[in-house]
Regions:
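Phosphate-binding site recognition
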Residues: 1-126
Length: 126
């Protein structure tokens, strides 16, 4: 959540965009709102965050977005090693499903991984 909030905050100019509706701005502010110095978006906003950002950037610039996700597999590996793999796969499946499958604001996306598939046990779990 903190990483998503920090990345969303990089686009703070969206708060003042004359191309976004007040509802768009409320959704954006839900992504960057802080509570006790921590980003505090709810789970629904977190899961939709990549799609929301791409939609808002599309509305602002009038051009479809390009989504670059580097080392997507690192959070999965950490989750596997620390016992919260099921929760992480649910989150990533939701985020990527929203951002990549049902996103008319997306031109294309590139995902890279850094772990060797042959050495990653959780790719072979049933």
């Amino acid at each position: 959540m903190q990483l998503v909030g920090r990345e969303a905050n990089r686009f703070h100019f969206l708060s003042d965009s004359d191309r976004l509706t007040e509802d768009d701005k409320k959704i954006y502010h839900a992504m960057i709102s802080l509570s006790d110095g921590m980003y505090s978006m709810n789970e629904e906003v977190l899961i939709s965050s990549l799609k929301i950002l791409s939609e808002l950037l599309y509305k602002h610039y009038g051009k479809k977005t390009i989504l670059l996700i580097d080392e997507y597999d690192v959070p999965l590996d950490k989750a596997f090693q620390n016992g919260y793999y099921k929760e992480m796969t649910t989150l990533i499946r939701g985020m990527f499903g929203e951002a990549l499958k049902t996103n008319d604001s997306l031109q294309f996306a590139v995902l890279t991984g850094c772990l060797r598939v042959s050495k990653v046990k959780y790719f072979y779990r049933t």
